[in-house]
Amino acid sequence: MLGLAGRCSAAAASAARPALRRAAGPSHGFLPLLLSRGAGPAAAVGARRDHAAQAAPAAKAGSATGRIVAVIGAVVDVQFDEGLPPILNALEVQGRETRLVLEVAQHLGENTVRTIAMDGTEGLVRGQKVLDSGAPIRIPVGPETLGRIMNVIGEPIDERGPITTKQFAAIHAEAPEFVEMSVEQKILVTGIKVVDLLAPYAKGGKIGLFGGAGVGKTVLIMELINNVAKAHGGYSVFAGVGERTREGNDLYHEMIESGVINLKDATSKVALVYGQMNEPPGARARVALTGLTVAEYFRDQEGQDVLLFIDNIFRFTQAGSEVSALLGRIPSAVGYQPTLATDMGTMQERITTTRKGSITSVQAIYVPADDLTDPAPATTFAHLDATTVLSRAIAELGIYPAVDPLDSTSRIMDPNIVGPEHYDVARGVQKILQDYKSLQDIIAILGMDELSEEDKLTVARARKIQRFLSQPFQVAEVFTGHMGKLVPLKETIKGFKQILAGEYDHLPEQAFYMVGPIEEAVAKAEKLAEEHA
């Protein structure tokens, strides 16, 4: 027993420093920094963030040389004779054809550090030389990163040559000070009816897309990139964290087709950072930080309003759990890392609006077994300004986007922000849907005939509203067969207000399915009437 206790306390002690490491930088690792194309080298924002973007330094390469003493999967122990590298420093393995970066996670004593590899450790041998870079992982940033795909350490992976920038930034940075933050509240119009009406997104806010496997998180993110990034006209950063490589490839080619990425000149609007499912846990645990670092450059150096898309933030937590286990930390609830809240908080606090610019973040959040009380999604909830919950029950009805209108919430659903008309229509829609939900048990047992006339009218309008909340997406045209629609907020409010007022009680409910504005539903009803005539 004493031996076990001793080992546990030793493990806890060795975990203390890495925990501090995580607190120091929300995203750890080498993530390619994707930057905006506007200005030349900009002045640093302040002494606190001076290290974040500077002209490429001749890093203190060779400040210390160590040798590998152990390799356990993605964990590599390195011993130094002198000049022990601090926590979070990047080390580089010598004598390899491909670059392998290690990030210092723990100091073990006897001049040995335990590191996490950012790539596969195949072929490593004991005694191999390792060089301390003298700094955390640094990635290229600046206009040259737009239209390019990078990995976690900033290497281009799109086979289009090197990224020729003089700007580099460390992926670990502090969150902005309170005095730098802005409290302005504005709606970010997405053109998606159910989102804009019932759970509007705040400009400069954090939005979570919750859903189980296969209910449409990635498609919704792609539609948001399509709608918001184009209309918004600024720069976007997409961080692919632990998701399917095929989807990342599809997204890249769709962006080229839609003109968001231009291969011929420097007019691309988006930078891509990928650390997909096949990457080691170290890369997946840091790639979100790489993407965030790119977005921070746009915000702090160029004063841009940046859109940051992360697909999937759960994989960031999952990779952190794998790394934690490899480092020998005692797991917490449901097997997650004991530093779960710290890891999440240090990253999320960097995503904010300052007086110079904003980062509006849309994060897809996989919900294991559709259980919203799982520690990973539950920890994320606390940081969000709006939640869009995707429901399997709604997807089974064939209604897409499968957004749950009663579970989805927004901090800015306030009459003082969205206006009284929008607020009243949204609450009216939610009330009639809730009434319909409470009547469904009666309908299932007794049938529609047993309802009062008032309840029958409620059910009819609710079913029309439910179908009108569906919408054809531009990015899904290929497999839905419906032309995608982007609906302005005024049109959305007008349409639902008229349905609530009973102006379309005479139209069949199927006329409201997969249409854009209300005029299309009326036209579809006329077409249906002609077909049945």
UniProtKB/Swiss-Prot annotation:
Subunit and partners: Homotrimer. Component of the ATP synthase complex composed at least of ATP5F1A/subunit alpha, ATP5F1B/subunit beta, ATP5MC1/subunit c (homooctomer), MT-ATP6/subunit a, MT-ATP8/subunit 8, ATP5ME/subunit e, ATP5MF/subunit f, ATP5MG/subunit g, ATP5MK/subunit k, ATP5MJ/subunit j, ATP5F1C/subunit gamma, ATP5F1D/subunit delta, ATP5F1E/subunit epsilon, ATP5PF/subunit F6, ATP5PB/subunit b, ATP5PD/subunit d, ATP5PO/subunit OSCP.
Residues bound to Mg(2+) 1: T218
CDD domains cross-referenced by the UniProt entry: ATP-synt_F1_beta_C (cd18110), ATP-synt_F1_beta_N (cd18115), F1-ATPase_beta_CD (cd01133)
One of the record's GO molecular function terms: ATP hydrolysis activity
Binding site for phosphate: G214, V215, G216, K217, T218
UniProt family annotation: Belongs to the ATPase alpha/beta chains family.
Compartment(s) where it occurs, according to its Swiss-Prot or TrEMBL record: Mitochondrion inner membrane
Binding site for ADP: G214, V215, G216, K217, T218, V219
Record-given protein name: ATP synthase F(1) complex catalytic subunit beta, mitochondrial
FT transit peptide: 1-53
Coiled-coil ranges (or none): none
Binding locations of Mg(2+) 2: E243
One GO cellular component, as annotated: mitochondrion
Gene: ATP5F1B
BP GO annotations: angiogenesis; proton motive force-driven ATP synthesis; proton motive force-driven mitochondrial ATP synthesis
Source organism, top-level taxon: Eukaryota
Catalytic activity: ATP + H2O + 4 H(+)(in) = ADP + phosphate + 5 H(+)(out)
Record function comment: Catalytic subunit beta, of the mitochondrial membrane ATP synthase complex (F(1)F(0) ATP synthase or Complex V) that produces ATP from ADP in the presence of a proton gradient across the membrane which is generated by electron transport complexes of the respiratory chain. ATP synthase complex consist of a soluble F(1) head domain - the catalytic core - and a membrane F(1) domain - the membrane proton channel. These two domains are linked by a central stalk rotating inside the F(1) region and a stationary peripheral stalk.
Top EC group: translocase
Key words of the record: ATP synthesis, ATP-binding, CF(1), Hydrogen ion transport, Ion transport, Magnesium, Membrane, Metal-binding, Mitochondrion, Mitochondrion inner membrane, Nucleotide-binding, Transit peptide, Translocase, Transport
Record-listed ATP binding positions: G214, G216, K217, T218, V219, R244
The EC number(s) this enzyme carries: 7.1.2.2
